[in-house]
């Protein structure tokens, strides 16, 4: 196809001024979300980000387990950060809210499903998933990943990728509830490793733990063993987030 013909293709028509203005306004919205997040979260360290399903109701054993984990972390001195919505996000905030450290909700505006839970000391609101995910990562000392759907899997894949590629520092990534995660781990081992798309060492980037006390102990032991921080070369490769 010659250049003249391509220039008239409907998919390549120039952007009009109104659409350009809308896109420019979105950039300012995103900048505002980053600034608000940085200002509100910078002093809330150490913190643990907890991910999990919005669809698991109170009374479910996983809800109760998430609440217990968050309470234990809060009483151990960690601010607890969740997505701010219902389900296991609510359980995380509820447990932390009853503890000694701040409960933080990173709320996302969705056309359905998401509503803010009432157990938040600090609440932030986002239109954009990617700026919200930066806030989950930037100040976290550990990640706890409860059972969840596509959103939880997206968050898990992103944090593993950031650590694997050296774009953020290595910190504990803890998957909770072996019966839920075992199939995924088997697929990692038997399919991804087998085909060479990940290495066996990549499986060491995370652990599975089911006991509440073991989760808190693992985080503390990780930092007790981490005598030195990242090298200058590693720091140079980290994302500026």
Language-model features: locations:
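Glycine-rich beta-alpha loop segments
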Residues: 2-7, 13-106
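Short gly/pro/ser/thr-enriched loop/turn and capping motifs at secondary-structure boundaries
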Residues: 109-115, 152, 180-183
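Active-site/ligand-binding-proximal alpha/beta "capping" segment
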Residues: 127-179, 223-228
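C-terminal functional extensions of proteins
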Residues: 175-241
């Amino acid at each position: 196809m010659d250049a003249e013909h391509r220039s008239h293709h409907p998919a390549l028509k120039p952007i009009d001024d109104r659409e350009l203005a809308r896109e420019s306004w979105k950039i300012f919205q995103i900048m505002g979300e980053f600034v608000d997040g940085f200002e509100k979260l910078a002093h809330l360290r150490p913190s643990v980000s907890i991910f999990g399903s919005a669809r698991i109701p109170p009374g479910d054993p996983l809800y109760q387990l998430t609440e217990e984990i968050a309470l234990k972390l809060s009483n151990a001195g960690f601010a607890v950060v969740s997505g701010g919505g219902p389900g296991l996000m609510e359980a995380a905030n509820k447990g932390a809210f009853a503890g000694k450290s701040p409960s933080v909700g990173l709320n996302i505006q969705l056309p359905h499903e998401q509503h803010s839970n009432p157990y938040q000391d600090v609440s932030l609101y986002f239109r954009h998933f990617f700026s919200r995910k930066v806030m989950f990562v930037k100040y976290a000392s550990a990640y706890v990943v409860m059972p969840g759907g596509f959103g939880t899997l997206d968050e898990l894949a992103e944090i593993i990728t950031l650590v694997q590629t050296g774009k953020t520092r290595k910190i504990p990534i803890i998957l909770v509830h072996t019966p839920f995660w075992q199939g995924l781990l088997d697929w990692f081992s038997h399919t991804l490793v087998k085909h060479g798309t990940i290495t066996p060492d990549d499986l060491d980037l995370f652990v599975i733990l089911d006991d509440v006390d073991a989760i808190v102990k693992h985080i503390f032991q990780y930092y007790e063993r981490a005598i030195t921080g990242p090298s200058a070369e590693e720091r140079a490769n980290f994302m500026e987030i």
